[in-house]
């Protein structure tokens, strides 16, 4: 990488100093400023090979400056940093032409890596959309944890594409919110968003629901009916709980993805389709493939870009933000204004949340509606959590219990839950997967996403670790712990 002139704009002197030292060690010339007007003057004078800019500065928002820079110097790469770690910030940075978005606090090694990629990239900067900056300020996703930051960055990169996305995650993690965000802030935002839940439709009607049917196609088909593909033309089709789709319908869906056309049930004329497919499931599709319940070729067609949503227990630092968000929603809907004291909030952060964000939202709505006190305390929260169903209660682990004993205890409970029946086939792989995922994920977290160090820690070959990361759909967040 040859030496370059890098322009840094940030009103935090400490950040300017750190970036100057780090980039100068690599041989670059670094010019820094604490305001947007000076940065604009340098750019207008033709200075700089790369820009690193903050969003909030005393005189102007850094995001608002990007379109002006792109008009006079379209080839200039821009890296955006921000402490406003929301999906909106990431999307606005991407749609206005930023090369990369980094949330604060950032990892210095990651920033240096992004700088190297920006200076060495031969790919022309993405064209600015005609309606850039139209995104509203309503936040479809809440959270500033490292796991959510990585998801925001992935989503921002996908907004200008039509790539097929499959979202995985436990029930209640917000899979449909992600699908709607991909639509609402993407290139098909002016088209329809059509959702269909495979688990909620009788198996024999799924093909008719998806592709429509002709009059007389089957008993009771007294009129022609349009399917979801036709309804979603020009927009996004969200296939929720794709793991519950029958094999016959999977075959027809695969043909649509391969050929870009379909026929209605009972019809013969091919119909061209123009939709973006976003799928979601709480099930393990690879296990379903091994069990012969899901087509492997369809899996690879759908999982062009896989996104795994973490359960709430893996991002408990987001609980206070979510609680405040739901309380604000309640007050906006006419319920009394409430707050939650710190001991109660700490208890909510310790809870396991088997129902994830949906369970937390329901709890907050109950607190807002059923209790008269303005400040909700620990006693109220404890009472509410105690009233949840047994399956939703946090499991207290016996003190000093070893891993082997804990696994044995959980497996005994698992077999006992089936009473006289037996669990479904493939139990060995399912149990190993449940152990492997947290083991590898936590090892990567401990090594700040460094796969070489994680492989050494685990005693695995680096290629073996990479394959397991891919097979287990583990998201690697580099430089964060």
From Swiss-Prot:
Any idea which residues the entry calls the DNA-binding region? 451-470
Binding, ATP: 169-176, 232-241
Summarize what the UniProt record says about post-translational modification. Phosphorylated and dephosphorylated by NtrB.
> Which InterPro entries does the UniProt record give?
AAA+_ATPase, CheY-like_superfamily, Homeodomain-like_sf, HTH_Fis, P-loop_NTPase, Sig_transdc_resp-reg_receiver, Sigma_54_int, Sigma_54_int_dom_ATP-bd_2
Name the source's superkingdom.
Bacteria
A single Gene Ontology CC annotation of this entry is:
cytoplasm
Q: Which residues cross the membrane?
A: none
Record PROSITE patterns: RESPONSE_REGULATORY, SIGMA54_INTERACT_2, SIGMA54_INTERACT_3, SIGMA54_INTERACT_4
**Residues in Sigma-54 factor interaction domain copies:** 141-369
Domain annotation Response regulatory: ranges:
5-119
What would be one Pfam family of this protein?
Answer: HTH_8
Q: Which residues carry this modification: 4-aspartylphosphate?
A: 54
Q: Which UniProt keywords apply?
A: Activator, ATP-binding, Cytoplasm, DNA-binding, Nitrogen fixation, Nucleotide-binding, Phosphoprotein, Repressor, Transcription, Transcription regulation, Two-component regulatory system
Molecular function terms from GO: ATP binding; ATP hydrolysis activity; phosphorelay response regulator activity; sequence-specific DNA binding
Q: SUPFAM superfamilies per the record? A: CheY-like (SSF52172), Homeodomain-like (SSF46689), P-loop containing nucleoside triphosphate hydrolases (SSF52540)
CDD domains per record: AAA (cd00009), REC_RcNtrC-like (cd19928)
Q: Where in the cell is it found?
A: Cytoplasm
One GO-annotated biological process of the protein: nitrogen fixation
> Its biological function?
Member of the two-component regulatory system NtrB/NtrC, which controls expression of the nitrogen-regulated (ntr) genes in response to nitrogen limitation. Phosphorylated NtrC binds directly to DNA and stimulates the formation of open promoter-sigma54-RNA polymerase complexes.
Query: Which PANTHER family does this one have?
Result: DNA-BINDING TRANSCRIPTIONAL REGULATOR NTRC (PTHR32071:SF95), TRANSCRIPTIONAL REGULATORY PROTEIN (PTHR32071)
Protein name (Swiss-Prot/TrEMBL): DNA-binding transcriptional regulator NtrC
- Lineage of the species this protein comes from: Bacteria, Pseudomonadati, Pseudomonadota, Alphaproteobacteria, Rhodospirillales
